[in-house]
Amino acid sequence: MLDIQLLRSNTAAVAERLARRGYDFDTARFDALEERRKSVQVKTEELQASRNSISKQIGALKGQGKHEEAQAAMDQVAQIKTDLEQAAADLEAVQKELDAWLLSIPNLPHEDVPFGKDETENVEVRKVGTPREFDFEIKDHVDLGEPLGLDFEGGAKLSGARFTVMRGQIARLHRALAQFMLDTHTLQHGYTEHYTPYIVDDTTLQGTGQLPKFAEDLFHVTRGGDETKTTQYLIPTAEVTLTNTVADSIIPSEQLPLKLTAHSPCFRSEAGSYGKDTRGLIRQHQFDKVEMVQIVHPEKSYEALEEMVGHAENILKALELPYRVITLCTGDMGFGATKTYDLEVWVPAQNTYREISSCSNCEDFQARRMKARFKDENGKNRLVHTLNGSGLAVGRTLVAVLENHQNADGSINIPAALQPYMGGVAKLEVK
């Protein structure tokens, strides 16, 4: 959530920055809400002053034997109490409307984020690796994976479209990828591994920005009977749980940065994605991902963003996968991000690069929602900056390994870095 004081002091400038990302901030509505708030506050202060003044007179009037005047003053105080209660209710209503609105306003883009309306205007930063030239007719990951244990029909039978069953060799490869990613992040990059819940409350999702704006993208579950029924949600990413581990806390500055990672399933309804990527693993309702989160000092967050991108790149390099890094333009960034890099891996059968990681700096946007703070060197409580990134999406990495390392006979070469996680197996072969 944006800083309300920044909005109040620089309304026009904030509106201009939001317009760069395609958000129309209604300054007239904001000004009207502010006028209502100020009016109620002034009225409240006046009522309180009158109450205090009249209350002081009551004792004196009684002491002078002026009982009727004292009673009249007491009646005035009683009426003022009623008026103050109404003013408090009015102020609460204004504040609720303002708070609800603030929760729907996206973060401000960083000054160096390229301006653009959509993904077509993202900017390529670098390409790493050269796509392989095949001397045979290549297959996509569906045709390669099905003989190795990738079962789309089985997934659809159990749960409907966009669900998959994996068995045998392909299931082992999927597990090996996740373990390799976790080990790389914990042993080489300094992250602490976490295991977190897959079901969370709405306040948790509000903290990281998925609610209230993106409710339709989430799967929810109900718990309890009619009288105690509560709604909870399946996590769309472990970013939600990892980041919220610091909610409502004050972290000693010497403990920063916190570097957290977790392997989890992710659940997304893919609202608005009808007809997109209907074949294969690219877009699923349930998929695994290894997530990276950093909680850092505000002055270190952009340095941390570059570091996090490097951590994701190290996985792709180790798996010998060609990829590119792009900076998302203002019109393509996520709701809570100030700056985002996407890593896109080469997918031979599609003859293009596809997103496999997204690394974002949210600055204090999430921290303000979560009340996540640190105590600085002067003993002052300040909001931390939060960052998140995929390290990587396991299913899409599986797609990339299958397609980039395929052989003419349908076998798959296992990258050397992954072989220890496959029990020394160097090649997957159809049996």
UniProtKB/Swiss-Prot annotation:
It is found in: Cytoplasm. Consists of two distinct domains, a catalytic core and a N-terminal extension that is involved in tRNA binding. One of its GO terms (cellular component) is cytoplasm. One of its GO terms (molecular function) is serine-tRNA ligase activity. It catalyses: tRNA(Ser) + L-serine + ATP = L-seryl-tRNA(Ser) + AMP + diphosphate + H(+); tRNA(Sec) + L-serine + ATP = L-seryl-tRNA(Sec) + AMP + diphosphate + H(+). Catalyzes the attachment of serine to tRNA(Ser). Is also able to aminoacylate tRNA(Sec) with serine, to form the misacylated tRNA L-seryl-tRNA(Sec), which will be further converted into selenocysteinyl-tRNA(Sec). This is Serine--tRNA ligase. The keyword Ribosomal protein does not apply. It holds the Pfam family Seryl_tRNA_N. Homodimer. The tRNA molecule binds across the dimer. It comes from Neisseria meningitidis serogroup C / serotype 2a (strain ATCC 700532 / DSM 15464 / FAM18). The lineage of its organism: Bacteria, Pseudomonadati, Pseudomonadota, Betaproteobacteria, Neisseriales. Belongs to the class-II aminoacyl-tRNA synthetase family. Type-1 seryl-tRNA synthetase subfamily. Its EC number is 6.1.1.11. SUPFAM superfamilies: Class II aaRS and biotin synthetases, tRNA-binding arm.
